[in-house]
Amino acid sequence: KPEEDWGRES
């Protein structure tokens, strides 16, 4: 799920 991807990038 993309939402989790942002958490890793931040």
Curated annotation (Swiss-Prot):
| Keywords assigned by UniProt, alphabetized | Secreted
Q: Which GO terms describe its cellular component?
A: extracellular region
Q: Where would you find this protein in the cell?
A: Secreted
Annotated protein name in UniProt: Skin secreted peptide P1-3
Q: In which tissues is it expressed?
A: Expressed by the skin glands.
